[in-house]
């Protein structure tokens, strides 16, 4: 039997607000601001959830965890990711790899890269080498360049 291969792509954006850390890939990173959101505002995990859901045409994160539902107020996005990945597993698929890009001027993320990758690998129970995270800037252009927020994109390859 030929393997069933699916690709998913996701994106998320959150604006900065008052605070002293951001949560990215389940890791709290010190910063001069927090991220405005109904949940913990983890743009990395939200983009990854959308990529996984998109790979099997299962909707998007907002359909599964609406920001109008008080149950998800302040929710830990690792819990959301675990739920989404279980939907993938329940359909007989597994993650081959995830490639994530985070765009922001600040905070600088290089020293948190391994910890962020490991956090995702732990939630999904996959090998570290299946998770890639890259950080970039937008050369001071756009809302991320003006340090108004953070953007993350994720692409996944899953197979059955």
Swiss-Prot record:
GO BP term, pick one: terpenoid biosynthetic process
NCBIfam families: ispF
GO molecular function: 2-C-methyl-D-erythritol 2,4-cyclodiphosphate synthase activity; metal ion binding
Name recorded for this polypeptide: 2-C-methyl-D-erythritol 2,4-cyclodiphosphate synthase
Annotated site residues (Transition state stabilizer) in this chain: 38, 137
Superkingdom of the source species: Bacteria
Binding site for 4-CDP-2-C-methyl-D-erythritol 2-phosphate: 12-14, 38-39, 60-62, 65-69, 136-139, 143, 146
Necessary cofactors: a divalent metal cation
Subunit and partners: Homotrimer.
Family: Belongs to the IspF family.
Amino-acid positions noted as binding a divalent metal cation in the UniProt annotation, renumbered to this chain: 12, 14, 46
Catalytic activities: 4-CDP-2-C-methyl-D-erythritol 2-phosphate = 2-C-methyl-D-erythritol 2,4-cyclic diphosphate + CMP
UniProt-listed Enzyme Commission number(s): 4.6.1.12
Alphabetical UniProt keywords: Isoprene biosynthesis, Lyase, Metal-binding
Pathway named in the protein's UniProt entry: Isoprenoid biosynthesis; isopentenyl diphosphate biosynthesis via DXP pathway; isopentenyl diphosphate from 1-deoxy-D-xylulose 5-phosphate: step 4/6
């Amino acid at each position: 039997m030929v393997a069933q291969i699916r690709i998913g792509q996701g994106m998320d954006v959150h604006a900065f607000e008052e605070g002293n850390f951001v949560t990215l890939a389940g890791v709290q990173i010190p910063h001069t601001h927090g991220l405005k959101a109904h949940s913990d505002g983890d743009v990395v995990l939200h983009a990854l959830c959308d990529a996984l859901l998109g790979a099997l045409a299962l909707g998007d994160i907002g359909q599964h965890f609406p920001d109008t539902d008080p149950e998800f107020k302040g929710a830990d996005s690792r819990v959301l990711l675990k739920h989404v990945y279980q939907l993938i597993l329940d359909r007989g698929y597994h993650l081959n790899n995830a490639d994530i890009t985070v765009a922001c001027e600040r905070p600088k993320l290089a020293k948190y890269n391994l910890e962020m990758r490991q956090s995702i690998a732990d939630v999904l129970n996959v090998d570290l080498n299946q998770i890639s995270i890259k950080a970039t800037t937008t050369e001071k252009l756009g809302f991320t360049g003006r340090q108004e927020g953070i953007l993350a994109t994720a692409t996944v390859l899953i197979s059955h």
